Amino acid sequence: MKRIFIHGVIIVVILAIIVDTKATNPPGTKRVKIKNKPALYVDQHTISNIDWKEALCWLRSCSEEKIGTTECVCICQHKEKNSALEIDSIVWKQRYGAIEKTKEIKSLPIIGISSAQMATYCRIRSKLVNFKFSKQKVNYELLTEEDYQELLAARWKYLDNKSEFGEMTANGTIFFQGNFIPMQNFHGPITFRCKAVIK
């Protein structure tokens, strides 16, 4: 009888762990239910200036290869620039005003960056999340046009169709107010958000 009870407890614990692992959203994301498809885990908001600065801090502290290992510690006092994530401050000044006001713009979307820099951000974020949270391995990446279409179809409340910001897609187009615009034809500020793909 004791043996059956112990086996029952073990099974309940294992099931609780499995359910908990599946119910946990990857850090920074919201789960979106898509009809007849697996759930999509998407950033609730576009990547902010403070998110970007944190990734830049890590990249300034050590090489990208070492990020997400015990060899890398984030020390943000480094003044040397790393071109992989450095932003064009002129774009910030045009959009947000003087750089001295960065405390006021921390939560606003990051702008003035290239698609290569967006991809670097996604890789760094993936490494850090996988290092800090071992429950599930995730890969962060830009959303595709299909992802945005599914979010629109699901009427996802965090997708702002009136935003003045365009969002870069993995396809190289800009999602703007419910439409996809070729990058060369879009003249507004461009930002991005990530989706988390569970491995």
Task: Explain the meaning of each model-derived region.
Residues 24-36, 84-86, 101-104, 134-135, ...:
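Extracellular/periplasmic catalytic domains that process cell-envelope and extracellular macromolecules
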Residues 146-173:
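An exposed tryptophan-centered "aromatic clamp" motif
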Residues 1-26:
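Bacterial Sec-dependent N-terminal signal peptides
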Residues 38-43, 166-168:
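Short hydrophobic-aromatic micro-motifs
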Residues 21-27, 36, 47, 51, ...:
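Disulfide-stabilized, aromatic/cysteine-rich ligand-recognition loop
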Residues 40-152:
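Active-site microenvironments of metalloenzymes and redox enzymes
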